[in-house]
Each structure stands twice: as structure tokens, then as C-alpha cells.
């Protein structure tokens, strides 16, 4: 992964100030589609298709990405229209949704791929039709996408790996429950974690007892994997590197059945209310906070710039990413932050990302 630069915290704040915080959403079924915005594309500046991957790996897509993206587009260009679809974890469905969006006249596709490799076909079809593609959150592999908006995903894994390194006793056994192998981000998270932990595994400071990828990031798959790890290791587990909060919840469930919850460090990612609740309870140790509203707002800014035929500002596009296409992809890369019980107030609460009421009573 080739990242030339990463957005600093200060620049992220500047972007956040430039892009007003999203303030509204349009209701929709989680399995359906939604059309939001001002005039239709025939009367306005054009249509942006927002294609998100699922509703199971994280609650963020319905509760944050979709409403925040839509609100920002509406603010920046009230005449633009946002067509929203969720693939519910099916790559073929996402392909069909993309083709329909192109047929219906979308000028920009903002795609968070179900399958990073399969989604290359979406880029090919869009390119033939003169439609621009922004790869959102997850990178589409080996395809000439126009822009990429995400976080420094290897850094996410490094933060998780460093937490495990700092909080696991010498000689301790580590379990790694990674994300979906079809997700380029999951590969980056795992690589970042291994960059930190492999030297410790090699010199015997720590032991890697079990590692697996989790199909579709599905928490039920994660539960089975953690149960298998505990069985294989006879419950001799000293730390669990879990790729996100959804999987962390499954890890905690498996640990609880063996009376180990709260005794074993468990990592997470996404700063979900459930994950933060578990952190407050002491059963999850940390999460990696990614300011999703900022990510959605940045993607909206890029999409609107494309609709208007404007080149995005160099203050916005701050790096490049190698996705195997042979061409560096212009990228906006935001910085992730570790959240523990000690700094919840200074991070997710201070930013308005969530509230203690939601954390104490997650849905």
C-alpha cells in the first residue's frame, strides 16, 4: 500500500469546519433504495448514486454514512439528487444496482464495495458510460477509480496491534479475528497489525495461537471462529485482536461462555455504541474511532465537485493510493484514533459522534 501523505488531525479539523456537520436524513428501509435531494437530474445539476455494502457488518451505513452524505450533498448543491442503494452483502446485487444507476443517468457513483475485486466490473461499466467513480471507505481493487476516500487503514491495524503488544503478558497467546478476505480494507488492517506483531511473534515475546478471516464480516461467523479458537487453545488465550466492534461483540460472547470476558484484552474498530458500551463495562478494551461524518462529508464534496466539473482542492485530496491498477489513485486519507474508557469523553463525545446516553443504552 503506497500512501504518500496522510491527513493530519489539524487538516481533518479544517475539513470538518469547511464541511458543515450533517444535520438530517431521509427515512428508508434498510433493504430498499432511497432517493433524496432537490430536483431530478433533468432539472438539477445531476444524480449521485451512493452504493453501500450491507447493514450487518456495522450500523454506521444506515445511521451515519447515508444520512450524513445525503445532507452534505443537499447543502452543497440543493439541485443535485442522491440515489441510495444497499447491497445487503451481495456483490451481484451491488453490480445490478450500479448498472441501474448508470442506466438511470447517474453522473457519479460513490461505491463502498461488498467485494473489492468483483467491484472492478462496476468501474469498467461506469468508465464506458463516462460516469466517475469514487471508491468509498473500502478500495476497489485493480480498477482505475477516480478518487478514494477512507482512513489510513494500515494505521488502523497498527493501532490495534500496538494495543495488543502493550497489554499482553510476555509469552502470551494472541488470537486474531480478521475481517472479510474479500474486503481490501480488511487486508490492510491485518497487514498493519502484523507489521507490529510479527516481530514479537518471531522473537517469542508473544505467540500467535489462531488467526482467521471472517466471511462477510458476519458476527455469527466471528462467534464460531472465536469458539473454535478457544477449543483449539484449551481456553489459553491472553489477548484477542478483533478487527471491528461487531466481531468484538462475538468474541466477548464466546469469552463470556468460558468466564473469560473482561480478563482478556479485546480490540475493536468503528466506535459503535455497542462497542463503546462494552468498553465502559470492561469487556472490550479499545476501539479505533473513525470519524464517519467527516468521511461522508468529504465524499459528498468530491462528488459535488465532479458534478460541477470542478477539480477538487489540493487541500482536500491529500495523497494517493495504490490499488493495483497501475495508476496511483488520488485519495483523501483521514486519521484514525484509539478510544479507551479513559478518553471517551475527549474523543467521540467531544466530537458529537455519539452521546453517553446512547452508549449506556445502545440499540
Q: Where are the regions a protein language model picked out?
A:
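A residue-level marker of the well-folded mature domains of exported/periplasmic proteins
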Residues: 2-10, 22-363
